[in-house]
Every structure is written in C-alpha cells, then in structure tokens.
C-alpha cells in the first residue's frame, strides 16, 4: 500500500507511527513506510488518539470531523482517513 493511498470517493488513507509522551507535537517524516508523528499526550484512555486526530486536522487545515481513525486504536501504527485534501496536498503539508 505504501504510506498513502487514495480511496474511491476522494478520501485519502495513510499510515502513521505515533510516539506518545514526546516533548512537542510534530511530524518527523517517514519511518518504515509510515509517517512518524510525535505527540505530547500519553497513551492512556484514548488521549493520544484524540490528540493525534486533532493535530493532524490542524496540520492539514481541516476540521476535526474530516479526519478519522480507521485502524490501530490501541497500536502505535495507525491508519487515518482524511477528506477534503488531495494526496499531493497532503505530501506538501507534511513536507514529504
């Protein structure tokens, strides 16, 4: 699949590897076929997932409702789906 895949209907799915309890929220580039994202939130009671979705939405200039977690709720490796942005725009906004 690669780290990013266009879906029928215009949405984009991509894989991320989350590092919780980091010193700041940031995108660190590609690591092992996934986008590495560092988050300050701890991996407790869904806090890191919520912070991840909010951070990705803000980074892409989207509303939180346009970003959803598709797979990996309890894993560091997650698959997200976004609407309202092209694959090319996604790469540019993440500087990949």
UniProtKB/Swiss-Prot annotation:
One GO CC annotation: cytoplasm
Residues of the signal peptide: none
Family: Belongs to the UPF0235 family.
PANTHER family for the chain: UPF0235 PROTEIN C15ORF40 (PTHR13420:SF7)
SMART domains the record matches: DUF167 (SM01152)
Protein name: UPF0235 protein Helmi_20270
Highest taxon of source: Bacteria
Lineage of producing organism: Bacteria, Bacillati, Bacillota, Clostridia, Eubacteriales
Alphabetical list of Pfam families matching this protein: DUF167
Organism the protein comes from: Heliobacterium modesticaldum (strain ATCC 51547 / Ice1)
